[in-house]
Amino acid sequence: MKMKFGIISIFPEMFKAINDFGVTARAIKDSKVSISCFNPRDYTTDRHATVDDTSFGGGAGMVMKYQPLSAAIEDAKNTLGCGTKVVYLSPQGSIFNHRKAQELLQNDSLILLCGRYEGVDERLIQDYVDEEISVGDFVLSGGELPAMLVMDSLIRLLPEVLGNKESVVEDSFYDGLLDYPHYTKPAVLPNGNAVPDVLLSGNHKEIAKWRRKQKLIRTYERRKDLIECLCLSAKDKQILDDYKIDKVSTKGEE
């Protein structure tokens, strides 16, 4: 499976980070991913290559123009396929998470529209955008960083991109839970802080049990909202019940 990305951005140079480093660069080198950038400035019709203008009705900030953006999207569709889904990275979109990543992965190609300034002409959204996605409730200068975040998340989920399949399966959110704690050498730090004994035991069954317990506890402590969305097994529920009882009794002893 090869996934194709079309990027609509006035700063295509930013995507060198995806092309040149880490897992994503390796996926591109191995022809599992292709990235094509379409700069709206290349589709303007004036000598100043204007991509933005003032907002009707007044107000601060500039708005990205319909014409150069629509032309860039049309060219991207001609390159990637006329049915390619267009995703606009926008703070008004639905929140991006692991479930959304898996959903987007059903597409062989995606066009990611990166806005700037106050956003894009609303008519462009009406005519071209299939979905708006947000990476969180905060404001950024443009859609390039969110687009790279989405791309990285999708690329690492593609078959055979990661060398070890377990790396994907054991990631946070893969099963709806946060990841368990990780440790590496040395086994004991100079201050005496040591790796849990079970991880040094060589008993893979006990290690798996410990890791499952830690995933459950960590998610319960840090993201109760995730726990509430899961259908936990009776064994998982018992682990959490025991943890809550131990926590209460420990607190009572203090």
UniProtKB/Swiss-Prot annotation:
Q: Does the keyword Cytoplasm apply?
A: yes
Annotated S-adenosyl-L-methionine binding lies at: 115, 135-140
Q: Which UniProt keywords apply?
A: Cytoplasm, Methyltransferase, S-adenosyl-L-methionine, Transferase, tRNA processing
Task: Establish whether keyword tRNA processing is in the entry.
Answer: yes
CDD domains the UniProt entry points to = TrmD-like
A GO cellular component term found in this entry reads: cytosol
- Look up the coiled coil feature and give its residue ranges: none
Q: Catalytic activity, per the record?
A: guanosine(37) in tRNA + S-adenosyl-L-methionine = N(1)-methylguanosine(37) in tRNA + S-adenosyl-L-homocysteine + H(+)
Q: Where in the cell is it found?
A: Cytoplasm
GO terms under biological process: tRNA N1-guanine methylation
Q: Which GO terms describe its molecular function?
A: tRNA (guanine(37)-N1)-methyltransferase activity
Q: Which family does this protein fall into?
A: Belongs to the RNA methyltransferase TrmD family.
**Which PANTHER family does the record cross-reference, listed alphabetically?**
TRNA (GUANINE-N(1)-)-METHYLTRANSFERASE
What NCBIfam families does the entry give?
PRK00026.1 (NF000648), trmD (TIGR00088)
Tell me what this protein is called: tRNA (guanine-N(1)-)-methyltransferase
Which gene is the coding source of this polypeptide chain?
trmD
